[in-house]
Regions:
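Active-site beta->alpha loop and helix N-cap motifs at the rims of alpha/beta catalytic domains
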Residues: 4, 9-14, 19-22, 27-105
Length: 105
């Protein structure tokens, strides 16, 4: 069995990255908001730090944010520029998310 850990908790990632058979990591804004409270870090700053811990080859899924398709596309491109390595963009399954996928071909 392969596992993907969905968290924004940097300390947890540091603890489990080498202890468990974690195949990939994932972070979305709703999970990250709780993990980032009080740290002073942004979603992207935290994602960069997690990427440093897990290495560039490990799949890392990050959700693009935005109220409109255009905002989601802009955020997706920003994530790809900032977070190197095997990074994949998650798009919310909603009308604006589907529109973003269609527009950004």
């Amino acid at each position: 069995m392969e596992y993907c850990l969905d968290t924004g908790d940097l300390e947890m990632v540091k603890k489990v990255a080498d202890l468990y058979p974690i195949r990939c990591f994932s972070m979305n804004p709703s999970i990250a908001v709780n993990c980032l409270r009080g740290t002073g870090r942004t979603f992207l700053q935290n994602a960069k730090m997690i990427r440093e811990v897990i290495g560039e080859d490990t799949p890392f899924y990050l959700e693009a944010m935005g109220d409109t398709a255009e905002e989601m596309i802009e955020d997706a491109h920003k994530i790809r520029q900032e977070i190197k390595g095997n990074t994949m963009i998650k798009i919310p399954a909603c009308p604006q998310g589907f529109k973003a996928i269609r527009l950004d071909r």
